[in-house]
Amino acid sequence: IKGLTQLLKKKNAYNVVEKHLSKYKGKTIAIDTSILLYKYRYGSGNDQLSHIYGILGKCMSFLSNGVIPIFVHDGEPPEEKSEVLSKRTDQRTKLNNKIEDLKIQIREYTTDSDSEDDGLGKLKVSLSKLEKQVVRVSQIHRKEVFYLLKLLGLPNFVAEGEGEAGCVELQKKGIADYVYSEDMDVLTFGCTRFLRASNKKDYYTEISLNDILSNLEMNQDEFVDLCILCGCDYTSTIRGIGPKTA
């Protein structure tokens, strides 16, 4: 949801209280695995094991604090999201084309000059920045994490649709106490207790949907309408309407 975090903070819709993971000892937390994969793959460059190390670290963190994790993986995306997925594919293609162009310029620059100067240095910096923007999460990465968790004996499954929606479904059924994600979209699915990672190691910000609805003086349906007006992956935006005007 575009600008939702900033909007909720501006309206003081929830209290930002950070808790150490140990405070959730004995609790079950459904984890949006896709979010973690992108987090660990971001800026990893040629490191093909960053997602493995990252997931292992997360498992150790949860288990050592007595927390039971359930890893939920993305299934097939809903049809409503096809347009935004197509746009993202186009953006990645354009970004990859820019990267290839820069690589060609660097090769030509190196061939024409025996020494590095400011021009070549700037090209390399630009290339590095662009490469970090291309987050590569392949089906191989997803399968590796799935089988790693299976070998560790930890509960993990593929949702029917998106992983975040699957996490919320587990909470609604009483299987999970909390949902861990970095995506505020879980609130629109009706996630009542939502955890986001803090900048401090093993600390999390707990967000209560009931607090948000109470402070905004809205019910769940009205909140979902607000999120749609802000802009989401499932519908086109309305011209002139966004987080500030919704």
What are these regions (language model features)?
Residues 86-246:
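Extended two-metal-dependent nuclease catalytic cores across DNA- and RNA-processing enzymes
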Residues 1-104:
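Non-catalytic, usually N-terminal nucleic-acid engagement modules in DNA/RNA processing proteins
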